Amino acid sequence: MAQVRPQGGEVMSARTTRVLRMAMVLAAALDAGTASAFDRGAAAPPFDLPGKDGAAVQLAKLQGRLVYVDFWASWCGPCRQSFPWMNDMQARYGARGLQVVGVNLDAKSDDARRFLAETPARFTIAFDPAGATPRAYGIKGMPSSVLIGPDGKVLYEHAGFTEADRAELEQVIQK
């Protein structure tokens, strides 16, 4: 394996260097946006992203539905914990108008697809390796979620995911 020697220092593997570079790019992408759609009642920024099956995932086509948008990455532990809950919410409330959309932010879709093979999603998956959508939404960490009303306006936002968050998030979805 190739090794890189940073200035004045220890040897790092090329893989470690790549991972650090990707983390810095993602951190910069997430920190770059200062505008936030999180003002309740603000119009949610539109998105048009490639989906898991190749079809476009467009927020505009979900108008009239309650949309739970979750921003996630394959390396995010709490993201992995949130998937069974999101599967459950889609199954329980989908017939009542809920659409869960998971927006993956991995630089390589292969990383996301490996994650999805281990942790299946029974909801819509979209890919945004450039990070334009989280910038538009003012996302600073993962997982982060935004609930968008049938009128296309932001109803709620949440950062993180723990077992304790389940009840709070479900209450918001039920309203």
Question: Language-model features: where?
Answer:
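N-proximal helix/coil linker or "cap" segments that precede and/or mark the start of modular domains
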Residues: 20-46
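Short pre-active-site segment immediately N-terminal to redox-active cysteine/selenocysteine motifs
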Residues: 65-67, 71-75, 141
